[in-house]
């Protein structure tokens, strides 16, 4: 159960990083 929780947290962090990177590139292009 803990492994699935850590996988979910890792996925959410990765998605947040991708979103921030896209917004940063759009604002600074």
Curated annotation (Swiss-Prot):
Coiled coil location: none
Localization terms from the record: Cell inner membrane
Spans through the membrane: 5-25
Disulfide linkage: none
InterPro entries per record: YldA-like
The keyword Cell inner membrane is annotated on this UniProt entry: yes
Record key words, sorted: Cell inner membrane, Cell membrane, Membrane, Transmembrane, Transmembrane helix
GO terms under cellular component: plasma membrane
Membrane in keyword set: yes
Predominant subcellular localization, coarse grouping: membrane
Residues of the signal peptide: none
Inducing or repressing factors: Expressed during stationary phase (at protein level).
Membrane topology: Single-pass membrane protein
Descriptive protein name: Protein YldA
Natural source organism: Escherichia coli (strain K12)
